[in-house]
Amino acid sequence: VRATVVGVLAGLVRWVGLAFALVLVIHVLLTVGRANPDNGITVFFADAAQPLALAFRSLFTPENGDLRVLVNFGLAALFWLIGSAVLARLIRRLG
């Protein structure tokens, strides 16, 4: 039973990290792709991505807004992917 719970928990951590990274990547694609900023989908992903970007949101401040979104939100996506993988591995190892 314990192994099952550990496996499910580790899998859940990975899926959450993947979902967070996906939201950030979609926001980057919509921004760099010049999606209509008033569209509901664009607004949804922009709003959802802001808290997920954590401190990466303003880590780099290049003049070009697209580059700023690409670098900062891209780094945040990498953080969630790597962080969730490390945490899932730790859960499995300690479990």
Where is each model-derived feature located?
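N-terminal intrinsically disordered, cationic/polar leader segments
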Residues: 3, 7-13
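Hydrophobic, lipid-facing residues on alpha-helical transmembrane segments of integral membrane proteins
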Residues: 17, 48, 74, 78-86
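Hydrophobic alpha-helical segments of integral membrane proteins
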Residues: 12, 41-59
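Helix-boundary and loop/linker segments of multi-pass membrane transporters
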Residues: 1, 59-63
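N-terminal signal-anchor transmembrane alpha helix
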Residues: 13-34
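Individual transmembrane alpha-helix segments
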Residues: 62-77
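Membrane-interfacial segments
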Residues: 33-37, 87-95
